[in-house]
């Protein structure tokens, strides 16, 4: 078993003692993967629609310059999303790797108009678009992050980029050019901890990297033997008013890292799996993780020092997800995988209910579910197949849970002690891949497909 003792601290920052808050810069903004500290929960008071689709509560639809599964983020009146083009867009013909480009796109949230776009040549060679890895997600899988003044994007081997909100490039830096053992590509998204940009560059460097967010200077580099098999995104755990930990899941363990220095503060033995696909979830003083491939689930009390396996585990269980991260709301944790919804008590991990997603009413704006969502795509396909239907994670706003599968079926659920499907919606009759987790901000929901960005609101 890999242990936290095999974490290797390589470069330490000096003079960066600070306390980090897990709160985002503006409450109504959605500035990172899954919104405020990765919880997937919007605290906005604006109403959100139950039913929507073509001709109903669809505010706008904007064409994107390429594919991707990264999620949109919302900063003030702007929406940011990353894409890729030129290579690996079609399974039938991957094309020439030399043509691979990355894109950062900034859109006006009012009407979907593109305000600016930046195109980046890929650092080559990339992992090939073949097999069961990269074709599942492509080359724009990392969700950007913003501090309200700048926007940061991680493009794997092509590096880390920082722009101001007007599109001026402020800095760029390498995060390594390695690959994971399976050459599946990378997808972990960057987060901000105060002035430190945290980049989980597992496949690229077998490391978590810390950069000064204003200058791009690398502050520290911390290696872990198992980070090459990590595809999840960290979150911040506020232990007290003097201490915040960066928490990330790794094969067999959960780690708590000092964001100022990259030093490992604590580790906890966890799921029995050699890869970590989902992201940790933090609620108050408890850290939750659910992993796929039979890895199981765990709840850990925040804080501690060194090996906390014998002292901080609140409960552990056998629940598993595939890729998506659970949603925790009012003491209940909702897991969605393979068309099944399972709800467990966050306090003890005991099951509350389990049920299969079915329509709560006629689908709006499209044909019935079950058609392909991007062609016959690996492990059961994107078209509602049992293997490939779940990629995005559930989010919550206006007291309702929103979940989209890869085929583009969008379920609206009522949280509670039993499964209640309020509606099933579709935004398009076309075959598009909806693998990205939605973003919620100020009464609007943003859904990203392989071709378009959609804005839904109660009109």
Describe each PLM feature range.
Residues 10-21:
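Bacterial N-terminal signal peptides
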Residues 22-459:
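Noncatalytic, solvent-exposed loop/strand surfaces
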Residues 1-12:
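Bacterial N-terminal signal peptides that target proteins for export
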Residues 4, 15-17, 373:
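Residue-identity detector for glycine
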């Amino acid at each position: 078993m890999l242990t936290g003792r095999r974490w290797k601290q390589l470069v330490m920052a000096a003079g960066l003692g600070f306390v980090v808050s897990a709160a985002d810069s503006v409450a109504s903004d959605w500035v990172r993967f899954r919104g405020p500290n990765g919880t997937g929960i919007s605290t906005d008071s604006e109403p959100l629609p139950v039913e929507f689709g073509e001709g109903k509560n669809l505010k706008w639809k904007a064409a994107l310059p390429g594919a991707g599964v990264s999620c949109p983020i919302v900063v003030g009146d702007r929406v940011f999303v990353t894409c890729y083009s030129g290579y690996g867009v079609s399974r039938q013909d991957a094309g020439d790797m030399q043509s691979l480009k990355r894109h950062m796109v900034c859109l006006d949230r009012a009407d979907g108009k593109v305000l600016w776009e930046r195109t980046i040549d890929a650092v080559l060679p990339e992992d090939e678009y073949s097999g069961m890895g990269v074709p599942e997600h492509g080359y724009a899988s990392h969700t950007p992050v913003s501090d309200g003044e700048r926007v940061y994007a991680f493009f794997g081997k092509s590096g880390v980029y920082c722009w101001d909100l007007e599109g001026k490039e402020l800095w760029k830096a390498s995060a390594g050019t390695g690959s994971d053992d399976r050459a599946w590509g990378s997808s972990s998204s960057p987060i901000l901890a105060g002035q430190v940009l945290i980049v989980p560059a597992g496949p690229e460097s077998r490391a978590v990297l810390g950069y000064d967010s204003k200058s791009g200077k690398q502050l520290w580099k911390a290696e872990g033997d198992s980070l090459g098999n990590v595809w999840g995104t960290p979150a911040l755990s506020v232990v007290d008013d003097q201490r915040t930990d960066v928490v990330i899941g790794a094969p067999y363990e959960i780690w708590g890292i000092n964001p100022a220095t990259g030093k490992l503060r604590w580790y906890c033995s966890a799921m029995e799996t050699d890869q970590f696909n989902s992201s940790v979830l933090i609620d108050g003083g408890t850290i939750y993780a659910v992993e796929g491939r039979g890895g199981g689930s765990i709840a850990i009390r925040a804080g501690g020092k060194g090996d906390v396996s014998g002292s901080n585990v609140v409960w552990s269980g056998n629940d598993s997800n595939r890729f998506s991260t659970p949603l925790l709301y009012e003491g209940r944790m909702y897991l969605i995988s393979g068309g099944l919804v399972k709800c467990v008590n966050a306090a003890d991990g005991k099951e509350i209910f389990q049920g299969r997603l079915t329509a709560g009413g006629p689908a709006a704006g499209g044909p019935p579910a079950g058609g392909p969502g991007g062609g016959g795509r690996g492990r059961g396909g994107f078209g509602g197949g049992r293997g490939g239907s779940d990629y995005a994670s559930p989010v919550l706003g206006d007291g309702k849970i929103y979940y989209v599968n890869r085929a583009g079926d969008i379920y609206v659920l009522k949280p509670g002690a039993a499964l209640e499907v309020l509606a099933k919606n579709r935004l398009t009759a076309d075959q598009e891949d909806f693998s990205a987790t939605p973003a919620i901000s100020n009464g609007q929901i943003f859904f990203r497909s392989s071709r378009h960005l959609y804005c839904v609101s109660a009109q």
